[in-house]
């Protein structure tokens, strides 16, 4: 039987990676129905990172903006996820523990299902407290392995990190290849190794297209057992952004995976509203 691979539209990161501002809340709520109509996304990245800061620059209330933006996806049965910086929350400097605990409760109340937590240093001590905070708030805790290429960052290095995060109770693992420099075969070995540690752990692959590895990497991680792939959409895909959903869908379908079909009329609606 074909193995299913699901797609997540990294809407927030598409804009950030293109150097563009996130749309206003009225624009977000206008494009949401067309994204849903495309029929191919199991998840959408709706907030986190620098999203709320941009809302503030627009003079918008981030709390209201995120609630209105996530609402139609929930009604359609699509999960929403956000990015957070572990010890730093949404900032670039440490945040007190009591603030971080409240932060996840607020995000859940706003309508965010999954929190993707990362530490640029790959220090699990910075990530593990967030697992408990997310669970206390009723959120799914997805913890990241930040991918780079060096003599130190071996397959064993990443598997040891994944094992510690899984033992600490994380629900999912994200292979966060944010520079797009992970080598395809290497990443396939990492994913396969994680599935050996815990067969039913959900793995989501996030990558950027710049260096040119990521289409091959997507194929390799899916062959190794990856469950979700982050994708972008033209005109904000490729380059410093992410692989386009059309290309990823075609490649995986040709490779024998079960992937969702794309409503191309809706795709063009989304493009015209981005």
Annotated model-derived regions:
Residues 1-116, 120-274:
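Catalytic cores and adjacent flexible loops of soluble metabolic enzymes
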């Amino acid at each position: 039987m074909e193995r299913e691979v699901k797609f997540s539209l990294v809407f927030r990161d598409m804009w950030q990676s293109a150097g563009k501002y996130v749309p206003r809340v009225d624009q977000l709520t206008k494009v949401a129905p067309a994204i849903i109509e495309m029929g191919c996304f199991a998840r959408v990245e709706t907030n986190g990172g620098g999203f709320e800061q941009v809302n503030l620059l627009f003079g918008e209330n981030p709390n209201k903006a995120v609630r209105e933006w996530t609402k139609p996806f929930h009604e359609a049965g699509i999960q929403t996820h956000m990015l957070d910086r572990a010890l730093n929350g949404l900032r670039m400097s440490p945040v007190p523990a009591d603030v971080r605990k409240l932060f996840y409760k607020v995000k859940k109340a706003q309508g965010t299902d999954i929190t993707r937590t990362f530490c640029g240093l790959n220090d699990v001590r910075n990530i593990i407290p967030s697992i408990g905070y997310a669970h206390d708030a009723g959120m799914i805790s997805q913890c990241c392995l930040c991918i780079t290429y060096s003599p130190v960052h071996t397959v064993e290095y990443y598997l040891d990190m994944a094992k510690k995060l899984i033992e600490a109770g994380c629900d999912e693992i994200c292979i966060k290849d944010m520079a797009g420099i992970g080598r395809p075969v290497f990443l396939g070995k990492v994913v396969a190794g994680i599935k050996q540690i815990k067969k039913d752990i959900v793995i989501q692959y996030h990558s950027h297209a710049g260096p040119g590895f990521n289409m091959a990497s997507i194929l390799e991680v899916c062959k190794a057992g990856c469950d979700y792939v982050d994708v972008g959409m033209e005109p904000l895909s490729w380059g410093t952004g992410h692989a386009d959903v059309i290309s990823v869908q075609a490649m995986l379908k040709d490779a024998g995976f079960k992937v969702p079909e794309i409503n191309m009329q809706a795709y063009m609606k989304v493009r015209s509203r981005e």
